Regions:
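Short S/T/G/P-rich N-terminal loop/turn motif that feeds into the first structured element of a domain
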Residues: 1-51, 55-71, 78-106
Length: 106
């Protein structure tokens, strides 16, 4: 399993609109992507920082999303996000929610 972490700096007082755009616009796009597993989004208590972690079956499908659909997602969120979101990628080592165990390495 593979993860994308996207860090965003939110515009002031934009959390309600950010949440609405995620639910109505972004999540439906994600659900259509091959290999998409789950999305978890966190908003800081001050309401100016957020990050989202999307889980994918494999890196190739996450990369296809990154090249194809992600620019559209960034455009959807541009009204509530300041600057350019920072994207990092990871291999998932463990998840109790998804019952994943990392493969043993020699």
């Amino acid at each position: 399993m593979f993860a994308r972490k996207v860090y965003m700096h939110l515009k002031p007082n934009s959390v309600p609109e950010f949440t609405q755009r995620l639910e109505k616009d972004v999540l439906p796009l994600l659900r259509k992507q091959k290999g998409f597993q789950d999305e978890i989004t966190f908003v800081g208590q001050g309401g100016t920082e957020a990050f989202a972690i999307s889980l994918w079956d494999k890196a190739e499908n996450a990369e296809t999303y990154n090249r194809g659909t992600y620019p559209e997602v960034a455009k959807i969120l541009a009204t509530v996000v300041e600057g350019t979101p920072q994207v990092e990628t990871y291999d998932v080592a463990n998840s109790t929610f998804h019952k994943i165990a990392a493969a043993a390495t020699a």
